[in-house]
């Protein structure tokens, strides 16, 4: 069953149970591309804008109070998730996001008209353009929704997940701060380090990435709303930009403000490009952590085997008993995806031709995907890998004892050249450092014991 809806192009049949109208239906027909739906976070952000605009327009006397109440009631239902199925449009549509903006306008109007007893859909008493979209344009609504959805995702999903992983690693670092092991540079044996020190480096890297993300947020809090079509504010009343930013801040609990220059806010997306760069930084940190832990966990008998990673599932369909570092692999894969997303975001953000960037949907699709992947990845990795990993102290001690770079402790006492001679002799002849040093006559047994002490090689000033 269907009903007839109309727009400036003419009549079109719309499913009878749909709240949307003609423009949404045309988009469904004309853009049957892929299956990547416009993120619900964007659609809910657009809905929040409609609610805020109705309040501001009501206060300004630009919207009848009864119409404003109907819009707000319908918007609240959308924000509650009651009508998520009414947003079927894909990312691959007009680059301004106009069709998704109209999808929201039509759904809110269609539900508001039903609440008013006029049946589902239609344009009376609530009109999708004249009332729901009053004082707005898709060109300022959509970039505003992009910023709202992004800020909410970062604050509600990503930052708590980073804190969770950082806390998990910090707990492991504190627990193993005195467990001495071989350090490695260039993938080769180096001077000693503790497992706790190694993990503390991960925590510091996460802290840096988190600070970069937080530093990008103030620009994301700046909203394009009020710029309307080209940034001039045509058809928006004086003071509307400031008023709706304040209303959105109150409704969301986030410190949104009006963008100081609406022309840049419509034509450029530097704030989201900058945030994406920070997300890429976090992805790089997670890649390093995942790679290091799977290297340390390699084995169990023919690898480093210094860390036992939790066994989440059987690892092979052909090799019985094999267990793989799957959490590390998943984390590193999503990091690759985020890095790829950043390339797309950076290119799309550069396409602000004249007064409007028309790559907005692909930008926000990738930004929100990156945030979601990073948030889920941090939480999942902490729960299923970091929390259950355990160091193999015996294996660490074995590698430390066999390591040749302990010879570095002799540099201040016998000099670099003699120390290098000891290391080379030990390596080529299969000797221990002690055996090589004594054979060369460079020091006594007692001096070796006094000077080569791994637990004293862990901080500045050691063996000076």
UniProtKB/Swiss-Prot annotation:
Site (Important for catalytic activity): 329
InterPro entries in the record: Fum_hydII (IPR005677), Fumarase/histidase_N (IPR024083), Fumarase_C_C (IPR018951), Fumarate_lyase_CS (IPR020557), Fumarate_lyase_fam (IPR000362), Fumarate_lyase_N (IPR022761), L-Aspartase-like (IPR008948)
Entry annotation: catalytic residues: 186, 316
Binding site for substrate: 96-98, 127-130, 137-139, 185, 317, 322-324
GO biological process, one term: tricarboxylic acid cycle
Single GO molecular function: fumarate hydratase activity
EC nos: 4.2.1.2
Location of the protein in the cell: Cytoplasm
A GO CC term attached to the entry: cytoplasm
Keywords: Cytoplasm, Lyase, Tricarboxylic acid cycle
Reactions catalysed: (S)-malate = fumarate + H2O
Pfam families: FumaraseC_C, Lyase_1
Recorded metabolic or biological pathway in which this protein acts: Carbohydrate metabolism; tricarboxylic acid cycle; (S)-malate from fumarate: step 1/1
Domain of life (superkingdom): Bacteria
Miscellaneous note of the record: There are 2 substrate-binding sites: the catalytic A site, and the non-catalytic B site that may play a role in the transfer of substrate or product between the active site and the solvent. Alternatively, the B site may bind allosteric effectors.
PANTHER family per UniProt: ASPARTATEAMMONIA/ARGININOSUCCINATE/ADENYLOSUCCINATE LYASE, FUMARATE HYDRATASE, MITOCHONDRIAL
Family statement drawn from the similarity comment of this UniProt entry: Belongs to the class-II fumarase/aspartase family. Fumarase subfamily.
Function comment: Involved in the TCA cycle. Catalyzes the stereospecific interconversion of fumarate to L-malate.
Subunit structure: Homotetramer.
Record's protein name: Fumarate hydratase class II
Source organism (scientific name): Pseudomonas syringae pv. tomato (strain ATCC BAA-871 / DC3000)
Lineage: Bacteria, Pseudomonadati, Pseudomonadota, Gammaproteobacteria, Pseudomonadales
Underlying gene: fumC
């Amino acid at each position: 069953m269907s009903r007839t809806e109309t727009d400036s192009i003419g009549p079109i049949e719309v499913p009878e149970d749909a709240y949307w109208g003609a423009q949404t239906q045309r988009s469904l027909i004309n853009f049957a591309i892929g299956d990547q739906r416009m993120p619900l976070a964007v659609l809910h952000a657009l809905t929040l804008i409609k609610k805020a605009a109705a309040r501001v327009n009501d206060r300004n006397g630009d919207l009848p109070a009864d119409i404003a109440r109907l819009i707000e009631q319908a918007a609240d239902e959308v924000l509650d998730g009651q009508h998520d199925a009414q947003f079927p449009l894909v990312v691959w549509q007009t680059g301004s996001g106009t069709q998704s903006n109209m999808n929201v306008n039509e759904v809110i109007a269609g539900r508001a008209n039903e609440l008013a007893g006029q049946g589902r859909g239609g344009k009376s008493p609530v009109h999708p353009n004249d009332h729901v979209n009053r004082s707005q344009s898709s060109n300022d609504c959509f970039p505003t929704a992009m910023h709202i959805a992004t800020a909410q995702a970062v604050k509600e999903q990503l930052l708590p997940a980073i804190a969770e992983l950082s806390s998990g690693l910090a707990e492991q670092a504190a627990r193993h701060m005195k467990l001495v092991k071989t350090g490695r540079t260039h993938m080769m044996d180096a001077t000693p380090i503790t497992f706790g020190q190694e993990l503390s480096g991960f925590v510091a890297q996460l802290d840096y990435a988190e600070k970069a993300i937080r530093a990008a947020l103030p620009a994301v809090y700046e909203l394009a709303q009020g710029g309307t079509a080209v940034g001039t504010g045509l058809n928006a009343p004086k003071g509307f930009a400031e008023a709706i930013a304040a209303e959105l801040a109150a409704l969301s609990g986030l410190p949104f403000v009006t963008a100081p220059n609406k022309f840049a806010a419509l034509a450029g997306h530097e704030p989201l490009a900058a945030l994406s760069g920070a997300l890429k930084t976090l992805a790089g940190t997670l890649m390093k952590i995942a790679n290091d832990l799977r290297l340390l966990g390699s084995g169990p008998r023919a690898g480093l085997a210094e860390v036992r990673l939790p066994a989440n599932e059987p690892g092979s369909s052909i090799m019985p008993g094999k267990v793989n570092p799957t959490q590390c692999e998943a984390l590193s894969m999503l990091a690759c995806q985020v890095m790829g997303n950043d390339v797309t975001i950076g290119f799309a953000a550069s396409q602000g031709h004249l007064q409007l960037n028309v790559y907005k949907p692909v930008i926000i699709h990738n930004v929100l995907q990156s945030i979601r992947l990073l948030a889920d990845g941090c939480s999942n990795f902490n729960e299923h890998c970091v929390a259950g990993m355990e160091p193999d102290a015996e294996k660490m001690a074995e590698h430390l004892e066999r390591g040749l770079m302990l010879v570095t402790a002799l540099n201040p006492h016998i000099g670099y050249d003699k120390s290098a001679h000891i290391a080379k002799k030990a390596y080529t002849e299969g000797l221990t450092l002690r055996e090589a040093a004594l054979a060369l006559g460079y020091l006594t047994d007692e001096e070796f014991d006094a000077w080569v002490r791994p637990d004293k090689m862990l901080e500045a000033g050691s063996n000076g």
